[in-house]
Regions:
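Membrane-interface micro-motifs in multi-pass membrane enzymes
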Residues: 57, 72-76, 96, 100, ...
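Transmembrane signal-anchor helices characteristic of membrane glycosylation enzymes that use polyprenol
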Residues: 29-52, 220-229, 294-302
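Membrane-interface coil-to-helix junctions
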Residues: 43-103
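Start-transfer (signal-anchor) and selected internal transmembrane alpha helices
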Residues: 14-40, 275-286
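Conserved small/polar residues in nucleotide/adenosyl-binding loops
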Residues: 320-327
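Short hydrophobic alpha-helices at membrane interfaces in multi-pass membrane enzymes
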Residues: 166-180, 211-215
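Hydrophobic alpha-helical transmembrane segments in integral membrane proteins
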Residues: 280-319
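Membrane-embedded alpha-helical segments of integral membrane proteins
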Residues: 214-276
Length: 332
């Protein structure tokens, strides 16, 4: 009887452990995302607030219908408009830092959700921070615009909805409607959507050995891209490379930083790459901790390498003088 009682107790404890395992994994993931958001907030609020003030100082935003029409008249205009609205909150750096923290959390969570939809094991959750870390590196450039982050979020949301469509006709209709809308609203990040569709459909077709169908989908996507670009060129007289939406992500439209294309590529392929990593159900917390420490060790010097603290100091001084001048003017 004592042996049977011990066996029952062991079975109960094992069942409790099995039931608690998903909860503990969820808590670990939530904790990592919250820690990520807090780190981003502290950086922009304490370490790099001058860059937020610089953006707010040299931007004019109007709640005006004519201004809205002017902004959305170009590819990526909606992302530009939304980002310019959000930049107004940079006037108070704590609000600007909060905005950025929320946006960066959104980038990481959407990356993970897309990877999870491809079957990525929970153990690789820390690796979903990689694209967002690259965006952080890029945003330390004072000429990098917030519209890039907004456009990335738009595109990742479009990708996520696509993963729930299981019939080819629904997917085809979704692409035909969403692709031109996304190109116009988000700009060049539509290339992530395009790449996601191509990789997803090729994977499905090759798994079913429908090679010609896969090639046809690739040709169709490039034809859709060319058609949309041609229609845009009729309305907007800009170079072809700008008609893909590379207009509002950087302060100088004629410049397309390599980092933009690197980030676009990273968001496109990483969810699929994570799903191809080896599966393991043992020592999950240990592996997650090791990945997290490796990310910190790599990202810390990586982020610092993109910071220019001389410019940061100059921007902070300039902003302080500007506000002091405005205060004296108001007193007079």
């Amino acid at each position: 009887h004592n042996q049977q009682a011990r066996m029952r107790n062991l079975l109960v404890k094992k069942q409790i452990y099995i039931d608690m395992k998903p909860l503990s994994q969820k808590l670990r993931k939530t904790g990592l995302s919250l820690l990520w958001g807090i780190t981003v907030w502290l950086f922009w609020r304490i370490v790099y607030p001058g860059h937020l003030q610089y953006h707010e100082q040299y931007q004019l935003f109007l709640f005006d219908m004519e201004y809205w029409k002017e902004r959305i008249a170009i590819p990526g205009g909606m992302a530009d408009y939304i980002s310019e609205f959000l930049v107004q909150f940079y006037y108070h750096t704590w609000m600007g830092a909060t905005m950025l923290a929320l946006l960066f959390i959104g980038l990481q969570l959407l990356t993970w959700k897309l990877a999870k939809r491809q079957g990525t094991p929970e153990v690789y959750y820390p690796l979903s921070f990689l694209p967002a870390i690259a965006v952080w590196h890029f945003m330390c450039d004072e000429n990098a615009m917030l519209s890039f982050v907004v456009a990335l979020l738009m595109t990742l949301v479009a990708n996520y909805f696509y993963t729930f469509l299981h019939t080819k006709w629904k997917r085809a209709m979704y692409v035909l409607v969403c692709f031109p809308v996304l190109l116009w609203m988000a700009g060049a990040t539509h290339l992530i959507f395009m790449g996601w569709i191509i990789i997803s459909e090729l994977h499905t077709c090759f798994k079913k050995r429908k090679f010609l169908q896969g090639i046809g989908i690739v040709v169709g996507m490039f034809a859709l891209k060319a058609t949309c670009t041609l229609l845009i060129s009729i309305q907007i007289q800009n170079p072809i490379y700008q008609l893909s939406g590379f207009l509002g992500y950087y302060r100088f439209p004629a410049v397309i930083p390599r980092m933009e294309m690197t980030i676009i590529l990273l968001f496109t392929v990483l969810p699929y790459l994570l799903a191809r990593l080896p599966r393991t159900h043992k020592h999950v917390s240990v592996y997650m901790a090791l990945q997290s420490m490796a990310l910190v060790a790599i990202s810390y010097p990586y982020i610092l390498s993109s910071c220019n603290f001389d410019k940061e100091e100059a921007m902070a001084v300039s902003y302080t003088h500007l506000r002091a001048h405005e205060t004296r003017g108001n007193l007079v």
